Amino acid sequence: MKPIEERYLETLAELFPTIARTSTEIINLSSILNLPKGTEHFITDIHGEYEAFSHVLKNGSGAVRKKIREVFGRTLSEEDISELATLVYYPREKMELVRQEKDEEQMDNWYRVMLYRLIAVCRYSSSKYTRSKIRKALPKDFAYVIEELITEREDIEDKEGYYEAIVDSIVRIGRAEPFIAALSELIPRLVVDHLHILGDIYDRGDGADDIMDRLMSHHSLDIQWGNHDVVWMGAAAGSEVCIANVVRVCARYGNLGTLEDGYGINLLPLATFAIRTYGEDLCSCFRLKGQKQETEDTALNMKIHKAISVIQFKLEGQIARRRPEFGLEGRALLHRIDFVKGTVGLDGKEYALLDTNFPTVDRDDPYRLSEEEQQVMGRLKSAFLGCGRLQEHMLFLLNRGALYKVANGNLLYHGCVPLKEDGSFEEVLVYGRIFRGKALYDRLETFVRRAFFSTNPRHREEGRDILWWIWCGKQSPLFGKDKMATFERYFLAEKETHTEKRNPYYDLLDEPEVAERILREFGLQGEHCHIVNGHVPVKKGQSPIRCGGKVLVIDGGFSRAYQGTTGIAGYTLTFNSTGLRLVAHRPFTSTEDAISTGADIHSERVMAEDYTRRLTVGDTDIGESLRERIQELSELLEAYRNGTIAEKK
């Protein structure tokens, strides 16, 4: 048998069968190494807030407006820059608004002006890419014309006349609007080369399904799963306890529309059961979070909220007892209730319950679902497993996502790396074996994927159960607290019972040796390596910059519920050829305001790490892959020249 290296070169020779083809590819790849590094955009904790997320995606955390300023900063007024930026963000809506204010001749002139401006921004933004990469980004309908307009043509003497003729033709034949829309959608793609989503796409907002659709159409991205994403993944895999958690969170925030309208999940059996079981119950402990005034559906939603919460507590008790290694016996609380006194025993103390109406709880077997509850969960499970759109979204999360990512010297994850008080890695038991640090992440991810893809029923069940543990487990890297005090927050008035103690990780992030230890664990070390961390909102007075800039906490703060705590809408990060930029955003008002007034999200740069020289593709992970490819092609070239492999002309 031939050595594997020789077999590999023979396979490579099928793609590059001649010396000329091989040499050309080496030259092409070598030239790419010297191009400027593309811009990376880091967003986290979207929490289902589609409008705000969509706007940040369109404006690249200010990167698009920055490009416009670089092109026109000395020639356009601030008003004109805002108009052009709005056109890039919302081309169709902006053109419809302008059309209402201008006659046909004025509109044609406006089209011409905007076309020239958009072409200039496209040309400037595309300067760091190869023609091949630009062609792949171009919209098919206008690919040839756009390439002509944004590419310098040295063979044409009257360039201005050439471009003017193209623009006039576009306007004359009535194709200005779709062409402007195509250019506007191209610009953000050219400005931001790659997108990183650091978790929690799902949660309380009502647009998570639309966010997933948007991400699925994105040209280049990766996802680090958040705790809210993982519980949805568990639900889609058929975990009943995860399904109950998902439905409860949606009910708690008045967001059942994501389930019913977004995914077509039939909640009628649950609603019918809730009305029949809790019809006379005011369910006052189950008021909706963030609801400013009651609607005609409020009473029903509160009953649904209570019904699914009780089911959740039962299912969690079942799994806590079935999986004692998870260490979640403390979440099984129903058997600790004294139904006569209306109290619950917790940590050696007795607390009065705020709600004592539990008609479906069997005093002798409190974690057993009633027959009706079993039927409700059976219907919900079938709906989650049978929802094509949900399964498609979860498959995308699995294919493009992971628990962490190492990218261009940065370690990206949601939550925390579980640590002991002394800063060493916490030892975590996962199905009979101890894991810590990177090995813990890798092992957990294996079980997550088994929940969906394993053909072994036991492995699939282990995967489904571990998804719930990742959602709320004490040592879970995505949860990072000693308990999820859901029961206590509903039923107990005493605030001390609501406390969820955070993992020591969060208090140790300013220790250089801790940050360096985490980075080394994931294969990173050096001056320009960072931890980029999502999950925890940065409160007023706190800094997102930890450990002298080694750790960047970039909770996007899209959730309106947290904006009163943070005082802003959150942080995002960009990383381009000149360095890193941490940007703080003010809350987004609405898409309507952005279109009608040109209002953008007000962003303020709070940190810049500038490099002494401009980074190139050669300085990135892609550059490392390209150098490996060049080395392989060079070996093939040598094999052709020394006669080891024959050319196939």
Predicted features and spans:
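Feature recognizes metal-dependent phosphohydrolase scaffolds
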Residues: M1-K649
